[in-house]
Amino acid sequence: MTKTGTDHLKSLDDGREVFINGERVTDPINHAAFKNAVRSAAGLYDFQAENEELMTFVSPTSGERVNKCWMMPTSYEQLVERRKSLVAWSRLSCGFMGRSPDHIASSLLGQMMGLPIFERHSPERAKALSDYYAFARDNDLFLTYVIINPQANRSKEASEQDDEFLVCGVVDEDAQGITVRGAKMLGTSSIMANEVLFANIQPLQKGEEKYAISFVVPIATKGLRILSRKSYEEHANSEFDYPLSTHFDENDALIYCDDVHVPWDRVFVYRDTDMCRAQFQDTWGHSSQNYQAQIRLMVKLQFLMGIAKRIAEVNGIIGIASVVLVF
């Protein structure tokens, strides 16, 4: 069955470790800092369940309907179908949800388009990506990602920081997988996501192989902690005065791994600085996620232009020559 908002809210009740204002949050989906934004995300899934033809397609492996953000287009018509679904979701937030579920899905889709590049570096890691993509698609998962390093001493590389595990890196490996320790950013929407993709959008140097990794884990994985920034939603005391921050504050966050174990079938890049760069730059990963972002920004601009036009109408200046030129 098509995933609904209720399904998504239930999936977030998983014991995840979320911290804000220096304290552990015991019930993040109902906390004053997050509850409205979480329900805005859930509303996306209610919308797709109510508009199945517009928003979903049948998974080629599970036979269930999932969001079209996971669809690998093979024709112009499918490209148009997928775009229309991205536009429809963006309009629900007027373009203000920057990390809605279709953003990271689009990134993974683009990386899958470049699967041969992964295969040239490591057939095993390529298979892990391919299998995970099918898993995420078939379960219609909401993913976030952390792809930049914590801001510490910017004059130094990751390996030159005072703490060698300030940046998330490999501590150990065994037959079952790898163990990682350290932090990554920005984790936007991590409170309302199911899983998180770790990767590197910033270049790494030779000798920094311990940081040259990409993997995905559930948010509720043992040892994974979400450290949220201050919440705008929590301090927005009037929906009338703060219509955006009361509903669409996705809360950026630092994500810290305290010796998190990652199974091999969830590791996409391992100790390979060249593949870390290629993951986004040589595949369609970066372009595909930016495609979704440009659609969202288009919707946002339409919304802002609509507000500007309405202000001009209310103020009685819509007929002024300089205003007419704008609209």
Per-region residue spans from a language model:
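General beta-strand structural signal in soluble alpha/beta enzymes
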Residues: 20, 144-147, 179-181
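Acidic, aromatic-enriched beta-alpha/helix-loop junctions
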Residues: 39-55, 210-216
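Internal helix-loop-helix
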Residues: 46-143
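A short, Trp-centered hydrophobic/proline-enriched beta-strand micro-motif
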Residues: 140-153
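FAD-binding core of flavoproteins
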Residues: 150-296
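Extended amphipathic alpha-helical segments enriched in small hydrophobics
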Residues: 292-327
